[in-house]
Design a protein with these regions (language model features):
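Helix-adjacent hinge/juxtasegments
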Residues: 61-85, 92-93
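General beta-strand recognition
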Residues: 51-53, 73, 147, 154
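Short Pro/Gly-enriched beta-strand edge/turn motifs at strand-loop
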Residues: 8-9, 20-25, 129-131
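Extreme N-terminal tail/first-helix region
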Residues: 1-19
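Short beta-strand segments
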Residues: 21-58
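Charged, gly/pro-rich active-site loop segments
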Residues: 2-3, 81-159
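A generic structural signal for short beta-strands and their flanking turns/coil linkers
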Residues: 22-24, 37, 48-50, 68-72, ...
């Protein structure tokens, strides 16, 4: 990271930033064409290892790319605001407040029914705040649960 003064390394603060993000964008390489998909998500972190879960249709371009090229980039951000420094009316005196996370990892389709249930529960918890969810097997089998195992991730903020 070029701007070390903006780097966030505290795991508690990183978790706070992730918890306030509502969308994670995954970028795929589709034979030289970048394909970016915005997704709602849930996650778990253990010992500075992050795993994100998403859900979606069982067929389509995203699913095809997961099978074809599972190494992806991802991005999420929150608290974005553009403002003038010291009330200036000069274009170059504007800046942006933000918190963001970028990284790369490996995506896969979850096949284990219990891990699918866990992934869906994490997605719902992140988006609603409610921890306990019941999913019958028919519901679980109707969707793809996608797992992103993070290889590298950085967090940055500017106030």
């Amino acid at each position: 990271m070029r701007r070390k003064d903006r780097e966030v390394t505290d795991p508690v603060k990183i978790a706070d930033i992730i918890n306030r993000c509502s969308c994670c964008r995954i970028g795929f390489d589709d034979d030289g064409e970048v394909y970016i998909v915005p997704l709602n998500f849930g996650y778990e972190a253990k010992d500075n290892t992050y795993v994100f879960y998403f859900h979606g249709a069982t067929v389509g371009r995203k699913i095809d790319l997961i099978h074809k090229k599972p190494k992806v980039g991802f991005e999420m951000d929150t608290d974005l605001a553009v403002y003038a420094v010291n009330g200036s009316d000069v274009a170059c005196k504007y800046t942006a407040r933000f918190q963001s996370i970028i990284g790369n990892g490996i995506v896969s389709i979850v096949s284990d029914i219990e891990e699918k249930r866990r992934g869906l529960s994490l997605v719902m918890e992140h988006n609603t705040g409610k921890r306990e969810w019941d999913f019958d097997e028919k519901m679980i089998n109707a969707v793809a649960v996608i797992k992103l195992e993070v290889i590298k991730m950085s967090c940055k903020e500017h106030q």
